[in-house]
Structures are given as C-alpha cells and as structure tokens.
Amino acid sequence: MSRLHAHKRYHGQSGSKRPLRTTKPEWAPYDKEFVENKIIELAKQGYSPAMIGLILRDQYGIPDVRLYIGKSLQDFLEEKGLLPDIPWDLIYLLKRAYRVYKHIELNPRDTQAKRNYQLIISKIHRLAKYYKRKGVLPKDWKYSIEIARLYAVQ
C-alpha cells in the first residue's frame, strides 16, 4: 500500500527474495522452545511482529520463524493472545496520521502536508473497510483524530 498514491507505482520494486528453505538450517543453535519464549518475551515488551522478526534475524541469526515453530509469527502471537485489538499496519497509519496532523496544526500553510494527510486518511479508510469486511474490526469503527492520538501516544 505504500506505492498506492505514487506516480511510478510499478518501478523500482526489485529486492532480495526469501530463501526457499523448508527445513531448519543445520548451523542454527536454537531450538523451538527458545524461539517461542523469545517471541513471547519480545511481544510482551511491545514489539510488533515485524520488529520481532527483525530482532530474531539480526541478533539471533534466525532466518525464518516458521521453520522453527511451524507457523507464522502472526498466527503464533494470535494463538497466545498477544496481538493488539487493531492490526499493526492500521496502528502505524494512525500514528503517521497524527504526526502529520500535529505538523499541520503548527504549519497551517503547508499544503503538501495537507495533501499527504488526505492520502494517509484515504489509506486508513480503505484498510478499515477491508478489516471490517474480514471481521477484524467492529462494524461501527470509525477513524477520528482522537483515536489516532490515543495510538500515537502509546
């Protein structure tokens, strides 16, 4: 969704591909229990699933959590009840919207920031519509700057 409002939407998307490994690497010193405990510990500290994956990859050399625990990180956290009530991608958009809103309050003539704020709000509405349809968000959930402020302060 990051390229949704960009002019060159389909260019510059090259990058590394995930390895096609289906088994745990032989050189990995960690077992399933260690990885599960580390995930739970990091989730209780408030890290998002994306950050947990980065920490496990960079600090512990765990290339793919799924190879160790047999399920995705998101599914594991959902099973343990450690996910927030609003999905992480929506939380990040809410924080971003509040940050831009505060900037516009301080700089009311910044028209480019106003336009960016409108684009962020559009993404929030589109994502909220999807999550309402999937049953992740309640049907009466609506975006407001107060909701964004609550998540930005956390």
Swiss-Prot record:
What's the protein called, per UniProt? Small ribosomal subunit protein uS15
Under the subunit heading, UniProt states: Part of the 30S ribosomal subunit.
Its gene is rps15
Question: What keyword terms does UniProt attach to this protein?
Answer: Ribonucleoprotein, Ribosomal protein
* The UniProt record lists the keyword Ribosomal protein: yes
Q: Does the keyword Ribonucleoprotein apply?
A: yes
HAMAP family attached to this UniProt entry: Ribosomal_uS15_A
Query: Care to name a GO molecular-function term for this sequence?
Result: small ribosomal subunit rRNA binding
A Pfam family of the record is: Ribosomal_S15
Q: Where is the composition biased (Basic residues)?
A: 1-11
The record's InterPro entries line, in alphabetical order, gives: Ribosomal_uS15, Ribosomal_uS15_arc_euk, Ribosomal_uS15_N, uS15_NS1_RNA-bd_sf
Protein family per UniProt: Belongs to the universal ribosomal protein uS15 family.
